[in-house]
A protein has these predicted regions:
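Catalytic-pocket segment enriched in acidic/His residues
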Residues: 206, 218-222, 226-273, 287-289
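Small beta-barrel nucleic-acid-binding modules, principally OB-folds
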Residues: 22-32, 244-253
């Protein structure tokens, strides 16, 4: 939700050391109060450093980098905290193996048949008509059943238009001198395009297959924050207007490529009461046309209690 307020996500991911690979790990979003029209924010990041994770039987050491970003409104209240996370894999030179195969080397773009497209387009028609959107019909905590599924939401096949929409909303807009300023101090991480002789900015691998191949993957890939946004759609449709998302904690499991589908699916993991709030935990994931999960997240949603609502009158 808050990614449109500030410049993308928090500024971790700056460690660049030969032999140390960095991967996006997913983000945690905490919402302490509503963000309302007209609110103004000042924002700061708090660097939390690295935490080593145990990796038995692996040649590398794994570290998780965490950088929470705080959104402070005009009333000096913390409205939200978005914690960006990166995974670093550090392999000693003596244990590095030559890799002849590039990641996702066997990935082939799927060609969708008429039956598949009919299902996709029907899903979009239903979204436009509001089918499955809870809206003003209150979902009461007492009516929720653990284990019940949320209605699937269709997204895709993902294309450049979708990628550009994410770029604008997330404020990841780099061009000309601003783009050069972002990459000039570490050009060794930006490959030279053999067609033009110029360096290619890493963001380009989200839009163009040619650029993606320069970075070692076969196709342009979906930005992680957009995968998260897709999952949110399934949750907000399910919960209705009177509910409130308190926490979203996501994990990036694998790349999602242009041309891929995302089917947002989920279920109720548990319902509980904590600090007087009636809460539901949802397990939500996005899977592609092959049924492979690329992103997963746990949501904590506050619902209205029918008993408390009735007792207030």
């Amino acid at each position: 939700f808050e990614s449109c307020i500030s410049f993308g996500s928090s500024f971790g991911g700056r460690l660049r050391v030969p032999g140390v690979a960095r991967l996006a790990a997913g983000n945690k979003h905490e919402y302490l109060r509503p963000i309302r029209p007209g609110d103004e924010f000042h924002i700061y990041d708090k660097y939390m450093g690295f935490e080593e994770k145990e990796t038995r039987g692996k040649a590398y050491r794994m570290f998780i980098e965490s950088v929470p970003r705080y959104f402070i409104n005009q009333r000096d209240e913390i409205a939200a905290i978005a914690t960006g996370r990166n995974i670093y894999l550090a392999t000693p030179p003596s244990k590095r193996e030559r890799r002849d195969n590039k990641p996702y080397a066997d990935k082939k773009r799927h060609h969708y048949g008429k039956e598949e497209l009919d299902i996709i387009h029907q899903g979009y028609e239903e979204q436009l008509a509001g089918v499955g959107r809870r809206g003003a019909e209150t979902r009461y905590w007492e009516d929720v059943v653990e284990g019940e599924a949320i209605r699937p939401v269709v997204k895709g096949p993902y294309d450049v238009c979708d990628a550009c929409a994410r770029t604008v909303v997330s404020c990841y807009t780099y061009a000309f001198a601003i783009k050069w300023a972002a990459m000039r101090k570490h050009l060794q991480h930006h490959p030279i395009d053999p067609e033009t002789g110029e360096y290619r900015f890493r963001r380009d691998w989200h839009y163009e297959d040619h650029a993606a191949r320069l970075f070692g993957v076969p196709y342009a890939n979906v930005g992680g924050i957009h995968n998260e946004m897709m999952l949110v759609h399934g949750v907000t449709d399910w919960m209705g207007d009177d509910a409130f998302v308190k926490v979203m904690d996501s994990q990036d499991r694998r790349m999602n490529f242009l041309g891929d589908m995302t089917w947002v699916k989920g279920k109720v993991a548990r319902k509980f009461v904590e600090n007087g709030e009636h809460l539901v935990e949802l397990e939500v994931w996005g899977e592609n046309q092959d049924g492979v999960v690329h992103t997963k997240a746990n949501f904590i949603v506050r619902l209205v209690s029918r008993a408390e609502y009735q007792s207030s009158f």
